[in-house]
Amino acid sequence: ALIAGYESQQAFSSIFKTMYKQTPLEYRQNEVFYPLQLEFTLNKNPTAPDTMMQEISYATLADIPDWMNFITLVIDGFPCLDENSHLEQVKQYVQRRQALIMRDGSTIIGAAAFSYQTGSIDFLAVHPQYRHYGVAKAFLDFMMCNLFVGREISITTFREGDKADTGQREEYKRLGFAESELLTEFGYPTQRLILPPKQEKGDNG
């Protein structure tokens, strides 16, 4: 702790618990280790599609290897994510046509998985290099116009004040999501956010 620049072991433990929601000892004893950020390589020639929604397609089984590589770039938004479990879930979403991707050339720059039944977005992530390109909004617009017409959409994210949040919660609220109930998912404190149905022009209701 001292070598890393912390004033004391207590200071390190306090900050560690703020980020991981458990003490260093509990973290070791649980033997379930997960990163809050991994190294990633930037796309040397990024481009912003002129028509984002037109670049969205349903993911296929052939896309899954790229999807799993993409996961390592966006791990900061998914504490406690287990890659093996996620892989099995992605296969199911793909087979049900409930998984979407967006690419810049061969690079996946965004991915989403959702449930028709519950109206929930169960996974939504954007490549760190493209988080100011409107990718998340494009996915939402696509789903609201094609999949959840007239329905509200829900998503879960970090709770307010979570030090592990790199801006995901703020982005969702900027896109129109409103706070709903507090949850605990996979042992991690989260909160459900709700996006109301998109109103058509002239709809006074």
For every predicted segment, state its role:
Residues 130, 134-142:
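Conserved acetyl-CoA pyrophosphate-binding loop and the N-cap/start of the following alpha-helix
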Residues 147-164:
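Conserved GNAT acetyl-CoA-binding A-motif
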